[in-house]
C-alpha cells in the first residue's frame, strides 16, 4: 500500500562535530596543555502517523562521541610486568588513547487517542541503552575494567495516562501525566554485573581471594538476576522547538 502523506510526517536529522586542540612544544613546556581530538556523531528520527483520532509517534535519537588525548602509562615487559629503571623509578611511555565520552540511544513509541483539541490519552514506551563498551578510565580499557556495554545497563519505561499539547507553535510544550508507570532496569552481562575474584592457594593450603573487578549491578541486588522492575507514577515534560528558517538550532 502507498504511504499517504496526509497521514504520515517524517523528520530526519544528523550531524558530525569535531574539534582539534594543538599546542607547540614551547607553549606546553611553559604553560602546559595537551593536544587532543574530539569527534561526536548525532542522529535523530521522528515519525508521526495519524488516522482519525488515533496517532502514534515514534522517535529515535543517538549520540556517540570519542576523544583522543596523550596519557602516561608504565612500560611493560614481554611478560606484562611493569618496568622500572636501575633506581627503581617507573619507566613511563606517552601514547595517544581514544576514549568514549558520549554513548546513548533512545527509542520512544507513543500511541494515543485524541479527546479534545489539546488533550489525549494513551501510553509512552521509552527504551535507552548504549552502543559500545564502556571502561573504567582512559588508561584502563581491558576486560577487567569493563563497566558497561549494550543492554548493561538498559532502561525501559512504560506509562499510561493523559497528555497535554500546547496549541502555540512558539511554545511547543508537551506534558504527560501517568498515574500508572513501570520502570525496568536490565544488566545482561554477567561479567559486569558480578564481582570477579581470583582464588589462590598458598604453600600452607590457605585460600586467598584477589579482586579483579568490583560488581556494577546498576541497582540489581541479586547477582543471579539480570533485571529489576518497579512501579509507580510519572510526569514527563517535553519541549522541542527549532529556531531560524532552516531550523539550524533545536532545543
Regions found by a protein language model. Give the residues of each.
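Outer-membrane beta-barrel channels and translocator barrels
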Residues: 5, 48-52, 112-120, 167-170, ...
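Residues that define the transmembrane beta-barrel architecture of outer-membrane proteins
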Residues: 33-41, 99-105, 152-158, 227-233
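Membrane-embedded beta-strand positions of outer-membrane beta-barrel proteins
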Residues: 12-14, 58, 123, 160, ...
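Outer-membrane beta-barrel transmembrane domain signature
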Residues: 178, 182-251
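Outer-membrane beta-barrel translocator domains and adjoining extracellular loop/strand segments
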Residues: 23-29, 69-84, 134-141, 187-194
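Transmembrane beta-strands of outer-membrane beta-barrel pores
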Residues: 16-24, 51-53, 62-68, 125-133, ...
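Extracellular loop and loop/strand-boundary signature of outer-membrane beta-barrel proteins
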Residues: 24-33, 79-81, 86-97, 142-149, ...
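Residues on the lipid-exposed face of transmembrane beta-strands in outer-membrane beta-barrel proteins
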Residues: 16-18, 41-49, 107-113, 127, ...
Amino acid at each position: 500500500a502507498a504511504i499517504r502523506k496526509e497521514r504520515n510526517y517524517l523528520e530526519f536529522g544528523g550531524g558530525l562535530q569535531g574539534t582539534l586542540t594543538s599546542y607547540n612544544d614551547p607553549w606546553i613546556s611553559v604553560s602546559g596543555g595537551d593536544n587532543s581530538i574530539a569527534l561526536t556523531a548525532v542522529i535523530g528520527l521522528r515519525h508521526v502517523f495519524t488516522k482519525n483520532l488515533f496517532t502514534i509517534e515514534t522517535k529515535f535519537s543517538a549520540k556517540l562521541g570519542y576523544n583522543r588525548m596523550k596519557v602516561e602509562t608504565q612500560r611493560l615487559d614481554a611478560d606484562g610486568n611493569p618496568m622500572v629503571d636501575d633506581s627503581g623509578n617507573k619507566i613511563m611511555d606517552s601514547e595517544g588513547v581514544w576514549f568514549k565520552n558520549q554513548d546513548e540511544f533512545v527509542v520512544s513509541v507513543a500511541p494515543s487517542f485524541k479527546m479534545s483539541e489539546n488533550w489525549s490519552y494513551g501510553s509512552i514506551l521509552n527504551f535507552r541503552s548504549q552502543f559500545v563498551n564502556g571502561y573504567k578510565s582512559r588508561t584502563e580499557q581491558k576486560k577487567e575494567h569493563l563497566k558497561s556495554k549494550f543492554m548493561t545497563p538498559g532502561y525501559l519505561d512504560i506509562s499510561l495516562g493523559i497528555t497535554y499539547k500546547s496549541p502555540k507553535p512558539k511554545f511547543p510544550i508537551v506534558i504527560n501525566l501517568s498515574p500508572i508507570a513501570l520502570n525496568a532496569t536490565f544488566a545482561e552481562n554477567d561479567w559486569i554485573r558480578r564481582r570477579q575474584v581470583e582464588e589462590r592457594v598458598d604453600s600452607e593450603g590457605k585460600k586467598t581471594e584477589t579482586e579483579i573487578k568490583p560488581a556494577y549491578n546498576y541497582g540489581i541486588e541479586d547477582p543471579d538476576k539480570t533485571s529489576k522492575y518497579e512501579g509507580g507514577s510519572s510526569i514527563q515534560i517535553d519541549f522541542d522547538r527549532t529556531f531560524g528558517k532552516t531550523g539550524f538550532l533545536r532545543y
